[in-house]
Amino acid sequence: MLTLDTLNVMLAVSEEGLIEEMIIALLASPQLAVFFEKFPRLKAAITDDVPRWREALRRRLKDARVPPELTEEVMCYQQSQLLSTPQFIVQLPQILDLLHRLNSPWAEQACQLVDANSTITSALHTLFLQRWRLSLIVQATTLNQQLLEEEREQLLSEVQERMTLSGQLEPILADNNTAAGRLWDMSAGQLKRGDYQLIVKYGEFLNEQPELKRLAEQLGRSREAKSIPRNDAQMETFRTMVREPATVPEQVDGLQQSDDILRLLPPELATLGITELEYEFYRRLVEKQLLTYRLHGESWREKVIERPVVHKDYDEQPRGPFIVCVDTSGSMGGFNEQCAKAFCLALMRIALAENRRCYIMLFSTEIVRYELSGPQGIEQAIRFLSQQFRGGTDLASCFRAIMERLQSREWFDADAVVISDFIAQRLPDDVTSKVKELQRVHQHRFHAVAMSAHGKPGIMRIFDHIWRFDTGMRSRLLRRWRR
């Protein structure tokens, strides 16, 4: 069966213009206009998605099948083009019968054209085919528009769902344009309103605990590189070669479709001298569909600039991914559980804003893993927030899992974060020695987020930095009173 893409090529129907009109209409819809005004950070993210929409629409039109009736009419039209005028006169009754049988829009006009002329001349033969072709172009264009309208409705529905999700989560997870873009990419999954409301709930809890939020931000900045510029900078001349498009074309670079009369191909120019094809020539001229030579040129020139010689002293500490281990023992339930989950959500926000990865591991009697910064990050975050903290404490397994992850090339510069009350048994000597080796040889940093003032000092001594957030009633009341 004939595909719509083939039909468009046969009739020189440009679907690109139709696709662009549809996308412009979609972006100008009232729903998107209101959304862009409310969430300006997400506007750029949605705009960056336009090439994907355009490619999906092209594939849809390319794979679409033409209805059998229109296919049969197109085949008949192609066969009629090969007939001479005497042959066309003989075949005309069968052609008219076929058009009526197929309910072609051209059938009635074709009969009127034939009835209005007693003799079928060569000119009438050409006119008949030209008008028939125009009818086929109209039918093909209508079919393109119908398919694009269906796709527009489906695309608008998808975008509205993603806008609802992104709009709810943008205040919680999007701290800048980078985070907004990654959040929009994550919203492509199949999520229901009740699912992502869990993220909203913990986001609101995090806003109620500004000290916890600040703690996460301090931890995220703890590896920020420092640079000290010198003030005695001198100017130096710097030369480079730059390539620029030439003002005068130099050579033929190929063929293109345009309305440039001066660079027409000879076959195109020949059609202008044929009376029967003159109308076709002007139509293609208006639509910029004439085949012309493409001329390009380029030139190189030397560009001289002066720039200061800047010397800086760097204390380089790259900000890598987060590997977060969360204690899910029974002692971490209740308010501790809420704080641990909200803290991980704050780290996810930092990771999205700074284009870092955030990997969560829950440790008790077994290790459960989630990556909150991947393409399925929102779904992974929802699964993590749905977990209940009712297991045991196995810090040794937690550290072994972290060390195994740090040996991977993609995690070599990661920050390891352990969230616990640290009320547990002492670590085995082999684990302690391995952690110290990673700290000494590979400069890995281990952070402890202590949720209790009663954590064992012997366990916590192994960490590079201890971030304390006491969740006891006295500390909670003091924090609330200070606000």
UniProtKB/Swiss-Prot annotation:
The record ties this protein, via Gene3D superfamilies, to: von Willebrand factor, type A domain
Write down the superkingdom of origin: Bacteria
> According to its UniProt record, where is this protein mainly located?
cytoplasm
Keyword list, A-Z: Chaperone, Cytoplasm
Query: Which Gene Ontology CC terms are recorded?
Result: cytosol
Give its localization: Cytoplasm
By its UniProt entry, which Pfam families does this protein fall under?
A: VWA_CoxE
Q: Does the keyword ATP-binding apply?
A: no
InterPro entries, alphabetically? Answer: Uncharacterised_CoxE, Uncharacterised_ViaA, VWF_A, vWFA_dom_sf
Does this UniProt record's set of keywords contain NADP? no
Q: Report the family membership.
A: Belongs to the ViaA family.
Query: Which PANTHER family does the protein's record reference?
Result: PROTEIN VIAA (PTHR36846:SF1)
Give the function comment from the record: Component of the RavA-ViaA chaperone complex, which may act on the membrane to optimize the function of some of the respiratory chains. ViaA stimulates the ATPase activity of RavA.
Subunit record text: Homodimer. Interacts with RavA.
Q: What is this protein's record name?
A: Regulatory protein ViaA
Q: To which species is this protein native? A: Escherichia coli O127:H6 (strain E2348/69 / EPEC)
Q: What is the lineage of its organism?
A: Bacteria, Pseudomonadati, Pseudomonadota, Gammaproteobacteria, Enterobacterales
